[in-house]
Each structure stands twice: as structure tokens, then as C-alpha cells.
């Protein structure tokens, strides 16, 4: 597992995305790479077509297999259920429904949860029975919508175990699970998962043990004194909302007051920014020149029952989430006989030496391709990096081992929750827990994401 260094910052067992966005990113990135090499041959051989760079393929395969387990070879409808206000804007959900419909006997439909109906106890859409449902929101959102709109058909689908991800993952879909993995129970989990888990504690007035094994009498006061080394995050947050990072957000009192006011936060040891940074070429439009910009990276691993579906590369500031203004980055497997660092340095130097006007044309092509593919998120067009993030075949093999260990350890967490061992740490309301108990996971079809702050060999060298 030392083929790459770093930590996972969080896991998503609810409804992780990015599986189709990376497919589009690869198409755009490969075209940009070809254009860059037309300007100046770079001399680095890269593979943009490795199967794990297209995670949607494994995800769709899992959905089709889940349908076949229930319905055999019979035709059927697979529903992609998302919040009503997102139906016209989230491109990958639109593409998923279209992709499912391209298979013989399968109809994929994107819909809001209110469009489901019950007919003689069967969950249907416009009178047609539904086989499998991918739900693109977590159970807290489901419960809130149910209170407004009466979503009994969707809850019936949960009871019938038609929903992916199973709602039984929700109690362990909280960032405080890192306290379990890295705490007194660490011996029950894979060493590589434990070693990649940053020190984490539920944030409230308490005594606990610090990152170095030191006794902490008052976690709140300790956090204030050590703020530059820490991060505060909502236990169930997404898109970077509510996150406060030491140094990046220097006002410790504001961060702590926010966490205490909102409640249900975790405090986490900050992963050094240099570990998960890379230098990327960008166009400085004011100076009309090409420059290197230091960006933070995020490497999402998406895992299913059989192992890795693939990856999503993101980059930007802190946090890197697309919902917080970050972008996506093409990924490429290195085929040349050189190190990752040498490959990235050669790419950066070549792009820095290119004519600004010619590169402007490449960026315009990149933007045109993004529009053609409706490459947008809720905030609008998604930024795409000019050069790919480079990884090796050996690193992919290690990431596959990491994915298997992650799946196994999440199953251990569910077993601990079902046995009552996590009752003191899982703090979600009773109605939501009832939904979780309707559909235990137990390793059934699901997509799990781990967001890695990893260094594959191209992080900035110490100056």
C-alpha cells in the first residue's frame, strides 16, 4: 500500500456521484491531450482509456445485474430517482437513464420520487412495475420529502429491497465513523484502512485522546489552541458546505462557534496541504501567459461488490468539491518508462513553453466539448484541468486492494451498528433509523466512494 501516500478525507455510502462525470472528463481530456501534442510533441505516453477511468461502466453493470437477480431475463424498468429541482440540471443522472435504456429489455427513467405510485402493492411508474431504483439522495432528504409529499411508494420500494444504495448504509454514512475505525476498535479493521484514516473525534465538550495519544481534558478548548492543525466538518455534510479548515479559515472562534451552533460536527487532524497538491498549467488571461498554479487534488475511489468501479479526479482550492467551485481533472495511466514526477514535470514544462495564442485555441475547444456534453452541475459549467493527473499501473493495483479492504471494513461497521455497538456514536433521528432497518445492506449491490487526499508522486517537492 506504499505505492501512494496519503489519507481518505471522508467516505460516502449514501448516493455518491461522479461516475459519469469522469467518463466525460476522459473524452475531453483525451482530445485536449491530442491537441497539446499537435502544438509540441510532449514525449510522454499516456493511456486515457483504462477501464477504471470510466466508472460508470461498472456502476451500470451492477444495476443490470441487480435487475436480473430480481427479474431474471425479463424486461424491466430501472428508475433513477432524484430531487425534482435537479432533474433538468444534473447531467450524469440524465445520462444514466439514457444509458440504461440502451440495453435490450431495459427502460431507464429519470424521475422525482413523487412520480412513483403503488398499484396492488407494487411500486410503479405510470402503471409500469419498477424493478430497481437508484436514489440520488440520502435518507435524511428522503424523510424530509416524505413529510411534505407522502412518499409511501418509495418507502415500499425500500421495504422490498429495490433501492440502491440500500438505506441500511445510512447509519454508518457519517464522518464520525472515522473515530470508530481509528479509535479503540482499530484492531477490527484492515491496517491499510486504519493507517489512511486521519484522527477524528465527534465535536462537543468531552474528554478524549489526541492525535499523538495525549490526554485531552476539554476538546473544545484544545481545538481552539491547535486550530491551525485541524478541520471542522458537519458529520453529514456534502459539497464542502460548512467545512472550516485551519489556516485556510484562520478565525478559530468563528469555526468553533459555527460547529457548536449547528451541532453534529467532527474535528479532524488536517492532512498537510502539500501532500495532496500538484502544480497545473493554466492560462493567466490578465498577463496573457501560461503559468503554473498550485492546486489541491481529490481522488475519489468508487467501489462495488466486486471491487473498484473506478475513479474521479478533482482539483481546486479547499475544499475541492464541484459544489464549492472546484473542477474535475482527466486521469491517465503512465505507459512511458519514467517516474510519475518526471512525467508530470515534462508535461508541465512542455505546456509552459507553448504559445499563449495556440493554447487559447485548445481551451476554447475544451469549453466547446464541455458544452456539447452538457458538462454542468448545479452551479453551472464544470471546470476541467488542462493536463491529466498521472498514475501508474502498479498504483491502480494497490488502489484495487484498498477498495476491497474498504468494502470489507464498511461491512464491519454495519455489523457493529446492527449489534448496538455504535448506538452512542450514531446520532440520527428515530424515523430515519426505522427506514435504515427496512433495508439492511449486508454487502448487497451498492456504490461506495472514498475521497482520497493522495500523493501518487507529483506533489510539490520541498523548497
What are these regions (language model features)?
Residues 1-463:
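Preference for protein termini
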